[in-house]
Regions:
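Active-site catalytic motif of lipid deacylating hydrolases and related acyltransferases
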Residues: 24, 30-32, 79-171, 313-354
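Gly/Ala-rich beta-loop-alpha elbow adjacent to hydrolase catalytic centers
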Residues: 177-181, 185
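Loop/turn elements at helix/coil->beta-strand transitions in domains of secreted/extracellular proteins
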Residues: 71-73, 120-124, 169-172, 199-203
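Basic, amphipathic N-terminal segments that precede the first structured/catalytic domain
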Residues: 21-66, 104
């Protein structure tokens, strides 16, 4: 039993932590690689999750339910990078959305273990897109990085526009992403939401897994508590005491909202942990096999723009040596996110109705 639990835990939790930079560095320049065709979002096969059909985004932990078809809100979710192996096709920098093996990985990992965290808050929409290869985060060729990410974002923007026009119909919505998905979600906020009529329908944006400075989304505040709406949250999870290299050029600390308490220290630059929350307040993590919830396993505190947690208490977790818990940004706090997203949707309805 312990062996099975350990294998299941490591197989998911370490998904994005064991990437070898040299192995995954794409030797092909962007200009030498063809670009896969853009997806048509009027075709349902170009969506990982779509209400009205059965897909991985419908799954729920034991004892919980997804929102009904009459749910008052929608969720637009953007998955993280799964295109990380050495490409087996001619498309080296962006995924071909017709790739069945990669699509299956997306469905069985981030859609099942991340997107479902939001299905109590509303109806989940998640597009397939020409995600940029993991190499974009390693390559020294910044022009290649930009071109690959621009292609990925163009798909996300097209999917969002289609979602708004054909599905959302003016309803409140939650925006969520992780890692590369968070990059694209932040661009959506800047280019499609902030300063438009859509901003009035935004319940909240969940943007974990990437460093985002507080002033980078001008016109949209950071959520400062568990009930705030029309705002955004972000965090990046590391083992207690680990200090990642500062990724922001001006030396500022990125936003870190504690996903257990949903408190925000306001970016105060102090060499002490802010807003520490004991693991007894942790609502639960989701690991393989999907369905079981592990409660009271994580504590959390904010330090200089990152979320510190002591090594989570799971079967076999004593073997974890990595200090980067990026792969667990959402599923480590699965029930905390699930409860909070639904709570903000409820609060949004109260505020709008007042």
């Amino acid at each position: 039993m312990l062996r099975l639990s350990l294998v299941a835990f490591l197989s998911f939790f370490l998904l994005a932590e064991v990437l070898n930079a040299q192995h995954y560095l794409n030797p092909t320049r962007f200009a030498e690689s063809p670009v896969p065709p853009a997806p048509d979002y009027s075709d349902s096969k170009n969506w990982c999750a779509l209400p009205g059909r059965v897909d991985e985004a419908d799954k729920t932990p034991k004892g919980h339910r997804a929102a009904s078809a009459e749910a008052p809100a929608d969720v637009f979710y953007i998955h993280p990078t799964l295109y990380s192996d050495e490409p087996k096709t001619e498309f080296k920098w962006n995924q071909d959305v017709r790739d069945p093996d990669l699509n299956r990985q997306v469905d069985e990992l981030p859609i099942r273990y991340q997107a479902t965290a939001f299905n109590a808050a509303g109806l989940v929409y998640a597009p397939r897109y020409r995600q940029a290869h993991y190499s974009v985060f390693l390559t020294p060729h910044l022009d290649d990085k930009k071109r690959a990410l621009d292609i990925a974002y163009a798909d996300v923007e097209a999917a969002f526009d289609y979602f708004i026009k054909n599905h959302n119909q003016g309803r409140p919505f939650v925006l969520a992403g992780h890692s590369q998905g968070t990059l694209h979600a932040a661009h959506l906020l800047k280019h499609r939401i902030i300063g438009t009529a859509l901003q009035g329908n935004l319940v909240a944006a969940y943007l974990p897994g990437m460093p985002i400075p507080a002033d980078s989304l001008a016109g949209l505040p950071v959520c400062t508590d568990s009930l705030a709406t029309g705002c955004w949250v972000s965090w990046r999870t590391f083992r207690w005491g680990y200090r990642p290299i500062a990724p922001i050029g001006d030396g500022s600390d990125p936003v870190c909202v504690n996903p257990i308490s949903w408190s925000y220290s306001g970016g105060v630059k102090r060499d002490t942990v802010q807003g520490y929350v004991h693991r007894h307040h942790h609502k639960g993590a989701a690991l393989k096999p999907f369905g079981r919830i592990y409660r009271h396993r994580c504590d959390a505190g904010s330090y200089r723009g990152v979320l510190w947690v002591h090594r989570p208490r799971f079967p076999g977790s004593f073997l974890i040596r990595s200090s980067n818990y990026h792969a667990g940004d959402i599923n480590l706090f699965y029930m905390d996110v699930r409860h909070n997203a639904a709570l903000r949707v409820q609060q949004f309805a109260v505020v709008r109705g007042s």
